[in-house]
Amino acid sequence: MDWRNQGVVTNVKNQGYCGSCWSFSATGAMEGAYAIAHNKLVNISEQQLIDCSKSYGNLGCNGGLMDAAFEYAIDYNMTTEEELPYEAKGHILCPSVEKHISFSSCTEVTQNNELHLLQAVSQQPVSIAIQADTKLFQFYSSGVITNVSCGTETDHGVLIVGYGVEKGIDYWLVKNSWGPTWGSDGYVKLERTNS
């Protein structure tokens, strides 16, 4: 299963030197859900979340949570990357732009439940948090990172866009926000387990 083949995943993006992974993870899930519902892939603005969701507890380039980003999107709607491009920095004020991409709800997947996550990913790309401060992850280029080496201290928002099996190991196909030169064209395979 690979949502890229269904045309509901935008190209790999690069957050640069801004701690905004949470916004890329959230917009990736929104882009997928919107494309599936409307049969149209739109590139949703991460910058809007960075600049405008502070009252929801997000801190722009200093971190944030995908849940808060989804709450903001439901309350205020979203705009496109074309209308509000990513700048890899935050602004004090929320820019005034047309926000015409609406969402009515989001569903939280049970933590540490592989079956629930598998069911969710079979419906659309899913926003998740992982531990990315390990050298194994940072210098990943191919293969499957196994559960033993994954880590459990979440510090990075990413997007699951599919799943499969490689050399007998079940994996999640994960889109990162460190540009297409990182990993395997911007993607990583993480072993599929309950953690």
Cite the ranges covered by each PLM segment.
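Catalytic-core signature of thiol
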Residues: M1-S195
